[in-house]
């Protein structure tokens, strides 16, 4: 390799490192902002099961159809139980697919709806986390910051989602191990929240192992 080619490679590597460092720094600023907002976030925690819930919020990663389809089936299941649903999906890209824009009663936001520190700033996102749902179902299995931001600030009475060791911001957490798919998370949510005894406080705010 010539000296000129080596210099070009080094320059590219340097630029990549700079971009990666800057993005990491921006995420840290976002985390710091979220921690400050958490201190101002007051809500009434109250457990609900699927027999009691009347209105729920569903928050999910809508980037791929693989994750979208199980969520759509879950929404249909909830509506069959007479539960009113509010749905917000995040597209981990700059453009929302045109087909998504035709979905009635669904709202979406994308990377273009994030601030410089990755904070969701779309009106749909703000309206969502300010609503007092009976239950918030966060169906994100990858701990994406924009979704975690909304879930953390949500005023829902009862927050349900996957257990993450470093971010325990749900009231009811399911510890996925081998199968970390959205479909499996939903399956476990249906099992546990159909049988949850809301008077038993020992079941709240601890990770629940997924059923075999």
Model feature map: region roles:
Residues 55, 83-86, 158:
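Residues at the starts of beta-strands that form the adenosine-phosphate
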Residues 113-177:
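Active-site and donor-binding regions of nucleotide-sugar-utilizing enzymes
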Residues 17, 168-212:
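Active-site-proximal region of nucleotide-activated glycan assembly enzymes
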Residues 14-34:
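Helix-enriched interaction subdomains in cytosolic or periplasmic regions
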Residues 1-18, 212:
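N-terminal amphipathic/basic-hydrophobic helices that include classical n-h-c signal peptides
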Residues 64-81:
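Histidine-anchored nucleotide/phosphate-binding helix
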Residues 44-46, 50-63:
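Nucleotide-activated donor-dependent transferases that construct or modify glycoconjugates
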Residues 79-129:
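Conserved nucleotide-cofactor-binding alpha/beta core module
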């Amino acid at each position: 390799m010539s000296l000129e080619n080596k210099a070009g490679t080094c320059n590219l590597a340097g630029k990549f490192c700079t971009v990666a460092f800057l993005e990491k720094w921006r995420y840290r600023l976002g985390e710091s902002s979220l921690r400050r907002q958490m201190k101002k976030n007051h809500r009434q925690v109250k457990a609900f099961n699927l027999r009691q819930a009347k209105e729920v919020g569903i928050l999910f990663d809508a980037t791929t159809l693989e994750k979208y389809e199980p969520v759509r089936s879950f929404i249909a299941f909830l509506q069959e139980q007479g539960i009113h649903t509010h749905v917000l999906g995040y597209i981990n890209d700059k453009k929302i697919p045109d087909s998504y824009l035709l979905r009635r009663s669904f709202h979406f936001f994308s990377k273009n709806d994030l601030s410089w520190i990755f904070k969701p700033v779309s009106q749909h996102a703000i309206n969502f986390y300010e609503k007092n749902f009976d239950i918030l179902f966060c169906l994100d299995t990858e701990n994406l910051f924009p979704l975690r931001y909304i879930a953390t600030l949500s005023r829902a009475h009862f927050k349900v989602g996957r257990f993450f060791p470093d971010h325990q911001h749900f009231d009811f957490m399911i510890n996925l191990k081998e199968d970390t798919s959205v479909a499996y998370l939903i399956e476990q949510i249906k099992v546990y929240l159909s049988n949850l005894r809301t008077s038993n406080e020992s079941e709240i705010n601890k990770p629940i192992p997924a059923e075999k």
